């Protein structure tokens, strides 16, 4: 032990490592080497070793930081940590809206009303396109024979005055994107098989079948072997319920993983024996607690999604071909303004009875179909930043798949699957005038430019349906639009005489634009001191003297009944945003003005 050399393991940076190397050489090799000049060969060797040590130390520190959600920088790593906390998202969310369809239908022989044989039904899957190039797909049938449709006379016989054609108006819901089909060849058995489906823009897996016709089901995690399937209710005419939800054991299942490189499916490692249990409906008794050799009961939480007694985590496909149908947006700009959807791209239709109609009149009816959107189609939002993912993941971890607190509801809104659309900002408040636990949920979306807009009715309904799955039975939710208050301001700064005033102003504009790039939250106040602090950090600014706000209510801005006097606090230090409103600096280049003195 007396010959053991002293090594300092705490040296991590370039200078300390080099100093330790020189000290080591002087201490243990005083007669072998004593040239420590900067330009010597020994100095080169010391610098090289210290350089490598510094790089390795940095790499070690970086990787350690990437192991924690709080300190991660890389987007994919933050995303993986968030998934472990229960917050997961994938794909670009779909945009939803209501379209209006028009069709010219020949008049009946009597001239009173349209001929019912030519009242076409536009089927689910029909594709329409917008001026932005985005494709939208019909999610429900548009039946022009519905008596609720508006019918007006479109053409008349000039001689007799009798109607010859009627215009019929119908509506239907659409979602952005289209369906894609891909085939993936699967080789021999592999535990936890992972296959690439497609790009990271996929927002929904529609169906997965193998060559033998077996269907695979998507689950949240592989140990979850029970899904709930929609079954048509044959008694819907009497009880008003269109479908019945029934539990179903999914022996063949998979989970989705997604990062910047693509979308992947991961399977378990079970064999076909697991799928041959012939269990069509899950039986909770198979998951009953088993007591062996003890006279007490341990408190165990019952998981209703795990009703099959197996630990193989699902059947893994082998020596087959998987046919996968998935949905994805085919354009970047899918939030479109009103009247932007104007053409039918791919029509799927049917008539009541093909044997009773004329092919010429059929072509006339089909060619007359027109489409438009009376209201904007929204639902897509920008990919959340790393900071947003961190905040939302903490909320998802605390909510534990149930909605009890205010934060639970807000977190669960952000967890809504992308196939239902996406909410940019959400806020829940208790209704003080309610005695039956009513909650008010305020939601806002964004347009193609990233500016705040009101969510349409379809997106609100999707949000309510999503929340109903996990809310408390006696909670009632009302979804409202918040007031969008567009603000602007003028700042006054003193500039050092040695600096160019215009350059300093440009730097101030750039700094403030970056500050307001991230949209504020509903009910979030704006502290004016933050603007002063940002201005004072700009080189050349001696002091930020004043900031004067104004509310924008002109064209291209949101209309809000809230005045500036209602926003400014009594001491004038912040803008006190109402709980049902959200502040937005919509056009930084126009809404920020500066004066240099």
Residue ranges and their predicted role:
Residues 1-597:
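Signature of Asx- and small-polar-rich beta-strand/turn repeats characteristic
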């Amino acid at each position: 032990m007396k010959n053991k050399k002293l090594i300092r393991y705490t040296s991590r940076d370039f200078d300390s490592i080099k100093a330790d190397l020189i000290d080591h050489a002087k201490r243990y090799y005083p007669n072998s080497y004593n040239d420590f000049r900067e330009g010597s060969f020994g100095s080169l060797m010391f610098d090289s070793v210290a350089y490598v040590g510094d790089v390795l130390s940095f790499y070690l520190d970086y990787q350690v930081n990437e192991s924690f959600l709080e300190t991660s920088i890389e987007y994919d790593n933050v995303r993986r940590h968030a998934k472990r906390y229960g917050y997961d998202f994938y794909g670009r969310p779909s945009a939803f809206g209501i379209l209006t369809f028009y069709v010219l239908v020949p008049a009946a022989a009597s001239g009173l009303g349209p001929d019912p044989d030519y009242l076409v039904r536009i089927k689910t899957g029909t594709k329409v396109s917008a001026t932005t190039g985005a494709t939208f797909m019909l999610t429900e049938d548009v039946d022009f024979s519905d008596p609720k449709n508006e019918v007006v006379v479109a053409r008349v016989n000039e001689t007799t005055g009798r109607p010859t054609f009627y215009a019929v108006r119908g509506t239907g819901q659409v979602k952005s994107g289209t369906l894609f089909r891909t085939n993936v060849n699967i080789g021999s058995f592999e535990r936890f098989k992972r296959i690439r489906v497609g790009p990271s823009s996929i927002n929904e897996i529609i169906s997965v079948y193998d060559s033998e016709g077996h269907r695979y089901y998507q689950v949240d995690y592989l140990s979850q072997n029970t899904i709930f399937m929609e079954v048509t209710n044959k008694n819907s005419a009497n009880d008003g319920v269109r479908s019945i939800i029934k539990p179903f054991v999914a022996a063949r299942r998979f989970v989705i993983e997604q990062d910047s490189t693509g979308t992947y499916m991961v399977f378990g490692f079970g064999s076909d024996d697991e799928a041959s249990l012939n269990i069509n409906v899950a039986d909770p008794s198979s998951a009953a607690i088993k007591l062996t050799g003890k006279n007490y009961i341990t408190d165990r939480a019952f998981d209703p999604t795990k009703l099959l007694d197996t630990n193989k985590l699902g059947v893994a496909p082998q020596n087959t071909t998987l046919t996968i149908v998935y949905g994805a947006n085919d354009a970047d700009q899918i939030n479109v303004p009103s009247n932007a959807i104007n053409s039918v791209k791919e029509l799927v239709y049917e008539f009541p009875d093909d044997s009773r109609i004329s092919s010429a009149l059929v072509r006339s009816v089909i060619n007359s179909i027109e489409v438009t959107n009376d209201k904007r189609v929204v639902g897509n939002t920008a990919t959340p930043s790393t900071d947003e993912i961190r905040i939302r993941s903490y909320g998802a971890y605390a909510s534990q798949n149930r909605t009890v607190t205010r934060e639970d509801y807000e977190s669960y809104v952000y967890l809504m699957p992308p196939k239902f659309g996406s909410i940019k900002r959400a806020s829940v408040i208790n209704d003080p005038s309610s005695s039956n636990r009513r909650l008010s949920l305020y939601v806002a979306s964004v347009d193609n430019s990233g500016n705040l807009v009101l969510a349409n009715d379809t997106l609100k309904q999707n949000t309510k349906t999503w929340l109903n799955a996990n809310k408390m039975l006696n909670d009632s939710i009302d979804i409202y639009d918040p007031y969008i208050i567009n603000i602007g301001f003028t700042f006054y700064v003193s500039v050092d005489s040695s600096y160019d005033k215009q350059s300093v102003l440009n730097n101030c504009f750039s700094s403030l634009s970056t500050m307001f790039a991230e949209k504020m939250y509903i009910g979030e106040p704006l502290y004016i001191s933050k603007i002063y602090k940002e201005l004072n950090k700009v080189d050349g600014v001696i002091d930020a003297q004043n900031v004067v706000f104004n509310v924008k209510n002109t064209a291209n801005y949101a209309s809000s009944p809230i005045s500036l006097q209602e926003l400014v606090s009594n001491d004038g230090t912040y803008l006190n945003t109402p709980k049902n409103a959200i502040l937005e600096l919509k056009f930084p280049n126009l809404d920020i003005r500066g004066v240099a003195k």
